[in-house]
């Protein structure tokens, strides 16, 4: 009879339609679909949520551990800040040396500034004197240009001839032999010849 019942049972497919063979023990579903079905039931009933006792125990233990570990860290940070706030002797010495050097530089700059101010005052006084001299020169009457012949007192204007003796003559009295010129032309010519033709002298023969 048992053999007949085994032969009569035909394998059935999964009731969810996934394509696998189902099992009557799992409500006609395959093993995968049955596990998913159980997970859905557990999630709907809230059985997956963790127990409150474990969460509360963890929440109580964690703050205690954090506070215990944070105390030495806070103390170490306070110690480090206090040590950093205390002035070191090396920094004090460096500050003193810098202040002394800055005071010396200030004194030298003041000493240098005094001669500079004196020089500026002297230059200002010189510049003040120069305009006064220029004004005095400008006040002097300009020399009148000679526009008349020295011999006949005729107005010559721009057509006058200025001689080397320093006088102006007309076209008639411009020659030196006419107005008895006092300029020494011979001496001037001799001087020019001396300058243009220097004397060339050979080296002296050294006697043995």
Swiss-Prot record:
Cysteine pairs bridged by disulfides in the record: none
Source superkingdom: Eukaryota
Annotated region described as Disordered, given as residue ranges: 41-140
GO biological process: apoptotic process; cellular response to tumor necrosis factor; negative regulation of apoptotic process; protein targeting to peroxisome; protein transport; regulation of canonical NF-kappaB signal transduction
Modified residues (N6-acetyllysine): 204
Keywords assigned: Acetylation, Apoptosis, Cytoplasm, Metal-binding, Phosphoprotein, Protein transport, Transport, Zinc, Zinc-finger
Biased composition (Low complexity): 75-94
Presence of the UniProt keyword Lyase in the record: no
Record-level GO cellular component terms: cytoplasm
GO molecular function: DNA binding; polyubiquitin modification-dependent protein binding; zinc ion binding
Compartment(s): Cytoplasm
Biased amino acid composition, Polar residues: 41-68, 95-110, 120-133
Signal among keywords: no
UniProt xrefs under Pfam families: zf-A20, zf-AN1
Modified residues (Phosphoserine): 49
Residues holding Zn(2+) 3: 163, 165, 179, 181
Binding positions (Zn(2+) 2): 149, 152, 170, 173
Subunit annotation: Interacts with PKN1. Interacts with TRAF2. Interacts with mono- and polyubiquitin. Interacts with PEX6. Interacts with PEX5 (Cys-linked ubiquitinated).
Domain notes: The A20-type zinc finger domain mediates regulation of NF-kappa-B activity.
Known function: Involved in regulation of TNF-alpha induced NF-kappa-B activation and apoptosis. Involved in modulation of 'Lys-48'-linked polyubiquitination status of TRAF2 and decreases association of TRAF2 with RIPK1. Required for PTS1 target sequence-dependent protein import into peroxisomes and PEX5 stability; may cooperate with PEX6. In vitro involved in PEX5 export from the cytosol to peroxisomes.
UniProt protein name: AN1-type zinc finger protein 6
Source organism: Pongo abelii
Underlying gene: ZFAND6
